[in-house]
Every structure is written in structure tokens, then in C-alpha cells.
Swiss-Prot record:
S-adenosyl-L-methionine as UniProt keyword: yes
Protein name per Swiss-Prot or TrEMBL: Ribosomal RNA small subunit methyltransferase J
GO cellular component: cytoplasm
Pfam families reported for this sequence: SAM_MT
Organism, scientific name: Rhodopseudomonas palustris (strain TIE-1)
Function description: Specifically methylates the guanosine in position 1516 of 16S rRNA.
One Gene Ontology term of the molecular function aspect: rRNA (guanine-N2-)-methyltransferase activity
Cellular compartments annotated: Cytoplasm
Homology family: Belongs to the methyltransferase superfamily. RsmJ family.
InterPro entries registered for this protein in UniProt: 16SrRNA_methylTrfase_J, SAM-dependent_MTases_sf
Disulfide bonds: none
Length: 204
């Protein structure tokens, strides 16, 4: 058990950075909220196609979104399931947030054609940085567990073909985006990452 604790990433919605961001409401200005179009007056159903550590999904759910998380790696899915149940038991406030989160195990490329949502978010394993020390420990552990995401182009294509109004891809700020059937409608840039936003054209 001790070895697992040293080698597996921590998934925690109660303490750590996620808990702090929730308690202090520091996430209200997060670029992800702007990228998805989520606001206090606009509730959305969001599919997180690459759930990972669940941090983005929790942020969205804490701001009122209904979130479906898809994770294909069994070990990460199990970590997420345990963390969700721990948060549910922590307090009524957290239980209400977790109640808006549904965790699915599977390949998003297969599941997306069967689902409907307002927004699909994609945050794959990004290309390794040349300065690996800049990568936080939890992300290094996650990469060790899940490996790279060479099929991100296929996932983006599946998302763009799915029944949703908007697709949001989180990607390194200066890296070339995966090939796609169309260009992003717009981008929201941060210090090290950007959000490529694909808005489905309105039917005429």
C-alpha cells in the first residue's frame, strides 16, 4: 500500500489545491469557465472526455455545471471513484457538487457518439516539456500511469462530430494544435496553456 501511495497521483477533492480553490472561491476567474461559457446564469452539461485527476470537472461542477467524466485507464478511474465518494461523505455542500458529477469508464472516442452535451472538454497528456522539472509531481505521476495520448487527434475529431454546441481543447500555449476538421472559433490564452474553442455553427 505504501508503494502505491508513492507512485500513484493523488486525487483529492477535499484537501490540497482543489480543496483550497473551492474554499476560497479562487476558481471563479479560471479561464476554463470562460472557455466553456459557464456562468451563474447559464447552467451547462459538460462532458470531460479526459477526466484525469478530475480537477477541471470538479471546478465546473462547483460552479453549477452538470459534468460527465470519462476516464479510460482503470487505475485512474478507480482513484477518481474513491475520491468522489470521499468528498461525498465529507459534507452536504460537497455532496451536492459530487451529485452533479457522473463518472464513466471507457474510451471517449467510443462513448461520445452515444452522448449529448452542451460542451465537451479535452485535456490530454500534452507533449513533454523540454524542462521536465517544470512539470508538477502529480502530472508526472499521472503521465507515468497513463502514458502519452497519441490518439488525441482522433478524440478531437470524435468530439467535433458529437452532439454538442462547443468543444474546448486545453493545449500548451505555443504548441501546434492536433489536426482538426476546422479551425478554432477563438482561443483563450494563459501563461503556459491555451484553450482552443470550437463553437458549432448555428443552423440556418
Amino acid at each position: 500500500m505504501a508503494e502505491t501511495a508513492r507512485t500513484a497521483p493523488a486525487v483529492d477533492f477535499v484537501g490540497g489545491a482543489v480543496g483550497y480553490r473551492f474554499r476560497t472561491q479562487a476558481g471563479r476567474s479560471h479561464a476554463l469557465l470562460k472557455a466553456t461559457g459557464l456562468s451563474p446564469t447559464r447552467s451547462l452539461h459538460v462532458i470531460d472526455a479526459t477526466a484525469g485527476l478530475g480537477r477541471d470537472a470538479f471546478l465546473l461542477a462547483s460552479m453549477g455545471a452538470t459534468v460527465t467524466l470519462i476516464e479510460r485507464v482503470p487505475e485512474v478511474h478507480a482513484l477518481l471513484a474513491d475520491a468522489l465518494e470521499a468528498a461525498r461523505a465529507e459534507s452536504d455542500e460537497l455532496a451536492a457538487i459530487i451529485g452533479r458529477m457522473t463518472l464513466l469508464h471507457g474510451d471517449a472516442r467510443v462513448l461520445l457518439p452515444t452522448l449529448q452535451a452542451d460542451v465537451i472538454t479535452i485535456d490530454p497528456m500534452h507533449p513533454p516539456r523540454t524542462k521536465t522539472a517544470l512539470v508538477k509531481q502529480e502530472m508526472r505521476l499521472l503521465r507515468d500511469l497513463v502514458g502519452a495520448d497519441p490518439d488525441v487527434g482522433e478524440l478531437l475529431a470524435a468530439a467535433l462530430s458529437a452532439d454538442c454546441g462547443r468543444v474546448v481543447l486545453k493545449w500548451p500555449l505555443r504548441a501546434a494544435a492536433p489536426p482538426a476538421s476546422r479551425k478554432p472559433s477563438h482561443q483563450i490564452a494563459g501563461k503556459t496553456v491555451r484553450y482552443d474553442v470550437y463553437v458549432r455553427p448555428r443552423a440556418t
